[in-house]
Amino acid sequence: MMRQYELVERVQRYKPDVNEALLNKAYVYAMQKHRSQKRASGDPYFSHPLEVAAILTDMHLDEATIAIALLHDTIEDTTATRQEIDQLFGPEIGKLVEGLTKLKKLDLVSKKAVQAENLRKLLLAISEDVRVLLVKLADRLHNMRTLGVMREDKRLRIAEETMDIYAPLAGRMGMQDMREELEELAFRYINPDAWRAVTDRLAELLEKNRGLLQKIETDLSEIFEKNGIKASVKSRQKKPWSVFRKMESKGLSFEQLSDIFGFRVMVDTVQDCYRALGLIHTTWSMVPGRFKDYISTPKQNDYRSIHTTIIGPSRQRIELQIRTREMDEIAEFGVAAHSIYKDRGSANNPHKISTETNAYAWLRQTIEQLSEGDNPEEFLEHTKLELFQDQVFCFTPKGRLIALPRGATPIDFAYAVHTDIGDSCVGAKVNGRIMPLMTELKNGDEVDIIRSKAQVPPAAWESLVATGKARAAIRRATRSAVRKQYSGLGMRILERAFERAGKPFSKDILKPGLPRLARKDVEDVLAAVGRGELPSTDVVKAVYPDYQDTRVTTQNNPAKAGEKGWFNIQNAAGMIFKVPEGGEGAAAKVDPAATTPKPGKRALPIRGTNPDLPVRFAPEGAVPGDRIVGILQPGAGITIYPIQSPALTAYDDQPERWIDVRWDIDDQMSERFPARISVSAINSPGSLAEIAQIAAANDANIHNLSMVRTAPDFTEMIIDVEVWDLKHLNRIISQLKESASVSSAKRVNG
């Protein structure tokens, strides 16, 4: 275990003016607090925070961050308090130690929800101070290094979470060395057989090619030296996880991989990077399509380097990375390499780390999504997806660079520029040409968004976008628009209900009734009434507890809408709302347009349904030509019944659930609808065949036939047929009745 003076010396190597008192005090305090604790391995618990601190010294972090690492488990696992740490080390260190503690104190139902909420809390904490991320990643790295002592199920859970969240997060924040080590450790426990096989093959390959690698390294160094470029060249081998992932994703065998070895060239200046590139390309043949310039266009995590692939001395492909030494440090340590020292000689002023980086820009965008939705697991999936995605770089007409994941569309671009631009997007010009909004953007595209103040993002856009930010914003806008529609409908229903009750009505009048209705605000009440979840009479009674409902309930028939017992209200947009007399809730919105179909699928041919609610037919079915009614099923959408269905009697006393609907059939209609016929046939040879022939002659499809009762001289059966409409069905029934083999035939409802 590292001694106190050894820790101080490690920091002094890169920061000679280190605050030794702070480090010594944190070391002694943490050691005393953890002195009676052991890890699962049997080692003293203090060895863990000490190793976390050591990892951070390898990243050349300041003494304040090292102190936070030493203290990070004290509040959670010992008698230490926030107040005590504030007094000894200052409130800022105390705040960060407490913040790291809170990340662990979660009590949710599903593992996925725990992981999602952990990620949310971590990202929010990072947004306040990036040192939370640095300590958290170092903490996870040491836990992964010592994971072997855990139970197998726990090892697997921690390894999967590391692979899904912590490794890609380290990469997204530019910390490539840490990302690679986390991936390798996780791979070892997630798929030990594959890890062992790939590791063994890589060791064999390295031994076989050691001489060749040394030759290429020497050749490169000599070329640079002859041309006056001060450069260091270092060979590197792909890590086992990187190799395995490529084999899996591209379906390759180990022997088919051609770029397992690579070289890193480090020079002093950007100019030398391009000079070195020119020398390499004039000495060896380059592989077309494998050149990437991340110096002129850095990655979103601030990674900068030139990548190229050449054909080496033995005709094998060799990948080279050319960068300055400063770029190399940023590539290894990411945001930690952006530290700006502001030492004022006090522990109360810990050193800050710059947030003016591309990695932080990604982080800020991700944080914005936290306010766009309330489903943590959904947020987790979107964020995990974006952590792994490759990028394309596009430009606004004014030259602003916008980084997007591969597969992004102009809609993603619009939301990346600003949420308001995304919400008002109606079209896009890509490189000066108007293109569909589903167009996949490519590197270098210039995108000009066409906007309209009247635009509301349609829900269908969600399937066209690749970024979590766009997806969350579309959901928010869709929810807001739907809620606004329902609120407007609820307002009109309540106005009528209060009028019938002889009571005054306004939004403010509803406020005293909120506790009785268990609703958070007035808009929530209005939307619930509009959706049919909350009867209007319940609202009247909540506001006026002495109100008595004296209505006489009768069977309400939506087919008689416009007659006594019903009234219509129409808004400025032409939407008609049919409401039962007495104000007992809404039937539903009657939209002049049919329900919007999903892509590639025609909607049900029904007018009068809310486009935001699912619609289905009742089991007994209805066919065009039937008089139909919709019944609002709270939480399950709308069910369509034929008006003669006996099942409707169950809703006689719930008029607020009845919806006036009608068919929306055109000449191009090619759909068939299920109907049921009860047939009593004479029990003689060939009678069943004759029934089938009648159906076939009328172009009807029998998809089910069941015998109900069989007697010596007749058979009763139920036939399910698919027909075009009511006329088609009646023609079949009429011909069945005329058949000598059939004694009776009639339609069955229910």
UniProtKB/Swiss-Prot annotation:
GO terms for molecular function: ATP binding; GTP binding; GTP diphosphokinase activity; guanosine-3',5'-bis(diphosphate) 3'-diphosphatase activity; kinase activity. Residues 587-613 are annotated as: Disordered. One of its GO terms (biological process) is response to starvation. Its EC number is 2.7.6.5. It is an enzyme of class 2 (transferase). SUPFAM superfamilies: ACT-like (SSF55021), HD-domain/PDEase-like (SSF109604), Nucleotidyltransferase (SSF81301), TGS-like (SSF81271). Residues 45-144 form the HD domain. It comes from the Bacteria. Residues 676-750 form the ACT domain. Residues 390-451 form the TGS domain. The keyword Protein biosynthesis does not apply. It catalyses: GTP + ATP = guanosine 3'-diphosphate 5'-triphosphate + AMP. Keywords: ATP-binding, GTP-binding, Kinase, Nucleotide-binding, Transferase. CDD domains: ACT_RelA-SpoT, HDc, NT_Rel-Spo_like, TGS_RSH. InterPro entries: ACT-like_dom_sf, ACT_dom, Beta-grasp_dom_sf, HD/PDEase_dom, HD_domain, NT_sf, RelA/Spo_fam, RelA/SpoT_AH_RIS. GO terms for cellular component: plasma membrane. Pfam families: ACT_4, HD_4, RelA_AH_RIS, RelA_SpoT, TGS. Disruption phenotype: Cells show morphological abnormalities such as branching and swelling forms during vegetative growth. It is unable to persist during stationary phase, presumably because of nutrient limitation occurring during this growth phase. It shows an important growth defect in human HeLa cells and in ovine macrophages MOCL3. At four weeks post infection the number of viable bacteria (deletion mutant) in mouse spleen is markedly reduced compared to the wild-type. The deletion mutant shows very low levels or absence of VirB at all time points of growth. NCBIfam families: spoT_relA. Functions as a (p)ppGpp synthase. In eubacteria ppGpp (guanosine 3'-diphosphate 5'-diphosphate) is a mediator of the stringent response that coordinates a variety of cellular activities in response to changes in nutritional abundance. It is necessary for persistence in mice, essential for intracellular growth of Brucella and required for expression of the type IV secretion system VirB and therefore plays a role in adaptation of Brucella to its intracellular host environment. Belongs to the RelA/SpoT family. This is GTP pyrophosphokinase rsh. It comes from Brucella melitensis biotype 1 (strain ATCC 23456 / CCUG 17765 / NCTC 10094 / 16M). The gene is rsh.
